[in-house]
Amino acid sequence: MNLREMSKLNVPIVSIITGEGCSGGALGLAVADRVMMLEHAYYTVISPEGCASILWRDAARYADAAEALKITSKDLLELGIIDEEISEPLGGAHSDYNVVAENMRSSIVNALNELAKKSPEKLREERYAKFRAMGRFIED
């Protein structure tokens, strides 16, 4: 679906990033009323290895690239790119699917209960404003 068309939907949109959200295609997940992310997932326009290869011509510098890209749920929550970090059990999501599923279910239900109170016009207006506010330019 075209991102412009998705942004015009009259119903609540909730996205959850559960693993690697990497590339321009994954960015479409941000055209939502609520964007959530598992705590050990990452979300970025390019993989850390790809970024390191381009910037430093050395994919081994992926850790430096990951830090610069701010790809973690904690970073993205602080930057306002995502709205919620969903906790995972000790050992990660794969260690207890039932716990992760319940955590995700709870977050989805809470978001939909909140969003259901808004008119379609308000949803579209807030969705547009949220997406347009992403990004930051900092001068030294």
Where in this protein do the model-derived segments appear?
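Conserved catalytic cores of soluble enzyme domains
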Residues: 1-105, 109
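C-terminal alpha-helix plus adjacent terminal tail
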Residues: 110-140
